[in-house]
């Protein structure tokens, strides 16, 4: 057991280290001719920002008086301002709109790398596609001060994910537009760690739940199991083998409009799950005649379709 704990600590330390990189040379330390001057000096020209900075979470670095100059207030992000103040113009200061995106990420991670939720940010699909901190966060003028988002979370995500926005307008959907859920209830925008299930098909930013399971389990805990009689697609392929995650034209957000057509994707005559083994046949006198509407709603009898503790065939 001790060895297992040691391994976990080692992996966590390695993961956090992976999120960190040495600061670029121009962000490292103040030189003799470019010293830290303190945030009070910034007020002389940037009062439109500093007057409300007390509401900003970054103001804690000033109030605590415990941080080093390179991690305090304005200069914690924009670098030493000595030369900038002397020149009186926009030179010799780190202006985020004009620096490379990799440098933006490096700057923010000087402070924001010590949590597991951001440990995989360099490999996240956002970073890989050129989306960095300032694309989503507005440090000086955020309408959502808690996370300094540039817009409300839903509208921010919809700015890029227009196809998902359309899905949330379908008849059967998760109620994100109504305010009952947020995108981050299921996704980690900073990059989650790929769960062990369906490694090749799940997006990296889907946050897994509990014991390395799908995020759906956070709300649908009754479907989690373990069950005495597991339904293989639920345990192996996951929820998306039958459901779509955002919205659908089909009841219960199913992938197909008619239940039996979805079931026949697996119970179709191949292997041990075939029509012969299950009694599902197309002949008129077979136990399950798919031409008869009576047998086209499989869940009418196989009620415990996510798994059962009582019946091998998921009957009530």
Region annotations inferred by a language model:
Residues 4-14:
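Bacterial N-terminal signal peptides
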Residues 17-316:
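Short sequence/structural segments immediately N-terminal
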